[in-house]
Amino acid sequence: MTKSIKRPPPFSCKQVLLTYVILAYTVAAHSSPPPCGLYGAPPCQFLPAPPGQTPTCARPGKTYCEHADNYPTYLIKSLVRKWGYEAATLLVDETWEDFAAVAWHDTPVFYDPKSIFPPRDPAAQDFNGYSYQTPFGGNPQRPSGGGNPLFVSNPSTEAPTYLLYTSSGGGHRSGHRYNSQGGGTSSSGGHLYINQSDKSTPYNATLWLKRLVRDLSRKQRQPDEVQAEVVEPVNEQTEEAEEQDNPAEDHPQSKRDVSLNMDLLDIVGVEAPNPLKKRSRTKRQSPGRSTLCQTTSQFITPQAALNSRGNWMFVVNEQNTARQMVKAELCASNTCSNLCELPNGYNSRCEQKFVQKRLIALQGNGQNLYTDTFWFPSCCVCTIAAN
């Protein structure tokens, strides 16, 4: 009796192909990045790259893409139209103007302290300036009583103010001095004492403005009169004789106009009445400027950018519907220029700095638009470090 031997059927091409496809899908499933959906949500379909990865449009070190692959233009247009009038007010381009070109560099105008510091409480008293200490260690008191604050009831003060003290040449003449006990004068010594009990000078807005306003009356005179007035000498002997005739007379307040204090006017920037007396100030700043790190500025309309949480998102930027243009400043080179020789063991390089800018972007699920902060290059800084 002969036994028949059963041979296994040969593998067909279809079976081999099916096995290959199954293996390929299995390997792809294990090597592909995990889906971006959380807690059973469907994978995100509107992202330039999965979380933790960089899209192919971004070069190494870049935080934005001007042209992103698979940019959802149609979806973004429909969502912008859904917003309606809000899109026109929320989507704003950055301007091309430079701050240095529009900044105001002139000397600020000096105003009355009352206009600079308005009263916080309407029912409270008006602001009469800060209570600074006098040059001799006292604290001036505020004037009491009502009336118009722009005018002083008593034109002469018992004790000189600090400004009058500086403009009167020290505040004393011929050895006279103020007595701190009786308020009188004595001829012994050269020191100045002020009665600081109740002899303080009240605030006067007229004198405040008079210090800083130039005297325009001399501008209207003839040039020869102004020159004669400046050249005319002062008879000092006659002035000393008049003071000796009245030794017991109290020391009067200096009648010199405080607006002629040239030190103060030079600080403010007011021109002198006589051009011959004008003092020229030499500028100490170097005329030219040089930068350590050269930069290139450009305005971009990014379609994808890296947000502050480290994820790449699609940014709303469609030329005809909605545009968000931002400024980027990139380092032109990696080495610092215009530097002196560095010590041994130190090197310098230009380092790119970034800032966060708030833009409107597309949500990962494509349902709506939202605002987010993205990183953009802002400046280039020269850093010196040890090797």
Curated annotation (Swiss-Prot):
Disulfides per UniProt: 293-350, 331-380, 340-382
Point out the signal peptide segment. Answer: 1-29
Propeptide cleavage-removed residue intervals: 30-284
Q: Where is the composition biased (Basic residues)?
A: 276-286
Q: What does this protein do?
A: Neurotrophin which may function as a ligand for the Toll-related receptors Toll-6 and Toll-7. Binds to Toll-7 and Toll-6, and probably acts as their ligands in the promotion of motor axon targeting and neuronal survival in the central nervous system (CNS). Involved in synaptic targeting of ISNb/d motorneurons and also some SNa motorneurons. May be involved in the normal development of specific neurons at the neuromuscular junction.
Q: How does it assemble?
A: Homodimer; disulfide-linked.
Query: Other remarks on record?
Result: 'Spaetzle' means 'noodles' in German.
Mind telling me what this protein is named? Protein spaetzle 5
